[in-house]
């Protein structure tokens, strides 16, 4: 299965067309174009996922990059997505979407402190928030949900084309002691339990 929307084909078609034309002209660049198109399709893959037990699940594939208690006492966990990770994001806990807000910004590397000013989409419920953050190469954030929509844990939330980071602010009932992942741990969206 592929990520929702036309983006996979929008990004894969140009290198595929150039690659096929170059191959027809016996140019070795054709292989590069076809390989790039295949990579784009692979990058936008969307495998089925099921949560591994009760609790909050991580919203993104990748590496846990930050676990921090905010000034308001809420816990924020960030997951950095590398190029090899699935980039479809998942719902951490069931809830009704209150708002989906696009915030324009820069495109700094997602692992840097400068990413605090990057483009992002903030998805909020009464209990939790997920922030999808663009990075240096990730220029498109595609939310799948709208305000008023009821979501189940592990549902598809959106995707970021070509990378970056997803942060989740846990429900107020959870504190730092409830978090069962560690910084540097590899996690899978919609499967790995983040907090119990």
Curated annotation (Swiss-Prot):
This is Putative archaetidylserine decarboxylase proenzyme. The active site is at residue 164. It comes from Halobacterium salinarum (strain ATCC 700922 / JCM 11081 / NRC-1). Heterodimer of a large membrane-associated beta subunit and a small pyruvoyl-containing alpha subunit. It is a peripheral membrane protein. Keywords: Cell membrane, Decarboxylase, Lipid biosynthesis, Lipid metabolism, Lyase, Membrane, Phospholipid biosynthesis, Phospholipid metabolism, Pyruvate, Zymogen. GO terms for biological process: phospholipid biosynthetic process. It comes from the Archaea. Binds 1 pyruvoyl group covalently per subunit. InterPro entries: PS_Dcarbxylase, PSD-A. Its main location: membrane. Belongs to the phosphatidylserine decarboxylase family. PSD-A subfamily. Catalyzes the formation of archaetidylethanolamine (PtdEtn) from archaetidylserine (PtdSer). Disulfide bonds: none annotated. It catalyses: archaetidylserine + H(+) = archaetidylethanolamine + CO2. It is found in: Cell membrane. PANTHER family: ARCHAETIDYLSERINE DECARBOXYLASE PROENZYME-RELATED. The gene is asd. One of its GO terms (cellular component) is plasma membrane.
């Amino acid at each position: 299965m592929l990520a929702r929307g036309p983006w996979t084909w929008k990004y894969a078609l140009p290198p595929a067309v150039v690659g096929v034309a170059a191959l027809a002209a016996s140019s070795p660049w054709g292989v590069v174009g076809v390989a790039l198109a295949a990579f784009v399709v692979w990058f936008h893959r969307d495998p089925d996922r099921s949560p591994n037990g009760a609790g909050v699940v991580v919203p993104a594939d990748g590496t846990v990059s930050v676990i921090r208690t905010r000034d308001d006492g809420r816990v924020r966990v960030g997951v950095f997505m590398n190029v090899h990770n699935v980039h479809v994001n998942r719902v951490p806990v069931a809830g009704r979407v209150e708002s989906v807000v696009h915030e324009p910004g820069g495109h700094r590397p997602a692992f840097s402190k400068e990413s605090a000013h990057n483009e992002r989409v903030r998805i909020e419920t009464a209990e939790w928030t997920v922030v999808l953050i663009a990075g240096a190469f990730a220029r498109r954030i595609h939310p799948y949900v709208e305000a008023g929509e009821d979501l189940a844990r592990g549902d598809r939330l959106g995707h970021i084309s070509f990378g970056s980071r997803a942060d989740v602010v846990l429900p107020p009932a959870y504190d730092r002691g409830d978090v069962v992942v560690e910084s540097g741990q590899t996690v899978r969206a919609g499967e790995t339990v983040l907090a119990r």
